[in-house]
Amino acid sequence: MQRVTSYLPAGTPSSNPIDRVELPHDLRHLRRKLLHLENGEMVMLDLKEPVLFANGDLLVREDGELIEIVAAPEKLFEIKPRNRLHLIELAWHLGNRHLSAQIEEERILILRDHVIRAMLEGLGATVTEVSEPFQPARGAYHAHGGHSHGHDHGHSHGHDHHDHSHD
């Protein structure tokens, strides 16, 4: 069985994957896992640190061959606002509830939740059930937990940190 110990970000030039693995958003945060490829083969993902993979990222097998990460279609709500200001207001309400959301110019996608749907419709949004890939925005608290920048540095950014709780 082939092992995967590295990856390349989506859009890497001159990359031709030999296979794909389709995963929903909640299964794309990985470090070590046996992955079942579309062709029926399996590979062992074995990374040094967890990575939050995006649609189109490429896993690099030990033999150099590439496997594409594909965002699986998921049952979502498509939220359409009245205008751009309304979209910002709706996004604020979703963020205030710590919900994963894919925010686009003219719509927001979230996982289906009928309580949230009622709230959004009460705020004047049009909410429709859709099934499509989900790539939620990465939150501020996850800023250093996704893709590596290829170098190490301290995270002090020139200021003191004051620990506090949001409880």
Curated annotation (Swiss-Prot):
Looking up SUPFAM superfamilies in the UniProt record yields: Urease metallochaperone UreE, C-terminal domain, Urease metallochaperone UreE, N-terminal domain
Under InterPro entries, the record lists: UreE, UreE_C_dom, UreE_N, UreE_N_sf
Entry's family note: Belongs to the UreE family.
What residue spans carry the region label Disordered?
137-167
Do you know which Pfam families this protein is assigned to?
UreE_C, UreE_N
List keywords of the entry alphabetically: Chaperone, Cytoplasm, Nickel
Principal localisation: cytoplasm
Name the chain's protein: Urease accessory protein UreE
SMART domains per the record?
UreE_N (SM00988)
Write out the function statement from the record. Involved in urease metallocenter assembly. Binds nickel. Probably functions as a nickel donor during metallocenter assembly.
Where is it found, in Gene Ontology cellular component terms?
A: cytoplasm
* Gene Ontology process terms (BP): protein folding; protein-containing complex assembly; urea metabolic process
The organism is Rhizobium rhizogenes (strain K84 / ATCC BAA-868)
- Where composition is biased (Basic and acidic residues), the residues are 149-167
Signal sequence, start to end:
none
> Molecular function terms in GO for this entry?
nickel cation binding; unfolded protein binding
Q: Which gene encodes it?
A: ureE
Where found in the cell? Cytoplasm
